């Protein structure tokens, strides 16, 4: 089984496990079970790894906004660490977070913020993708291609994807108290000539974090 197929199979298994724990109006934290899985990350709410989740205190006067921060200790892509004979390689990380609105509340907004930094010499090309999801629905993505002919000293993507209340893009129709799974996917893919030893790197910014906000509202 290929690495991509294995990751997909494990994602499905984790999602089934998370979904089985989520129930309408259940008495538990609004943002709770989570996992991070891929060639560049591996951790779970009850299994330590190279990602951890931190709660962010609620803002005064904003009772229905919930925030968490995921911190990545060593999620990075380095060309020099890959066998020169490999022409295409990359790193991926899929983060999944269960959101469980309390009784009488529904999800009305989702937001994700992160920063990706890349640098490279002439030679390799880089494809960088950051995507926010709710269940199987894509809420938005930021996609960049750094061409092989370009020398890039510093490229920074300030990713801020938002859907629902206060945003241009809507959320899918959700039921009162309906639990969902928020997803965020990183995909960094490099392509180079065989046996080409050229500098290239992709990393998260200094904070090495992903912040996810969820906004709830009274059901109407």
PLM regions and their residue ranges:
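Cysteine-clustered segments with highest specificity for TGF-beta superfamily mature ligands
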Residues: 69, 155-198
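A short beta-strand element within beta-rich, extracytoplasmic domains
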Residues: 106-119
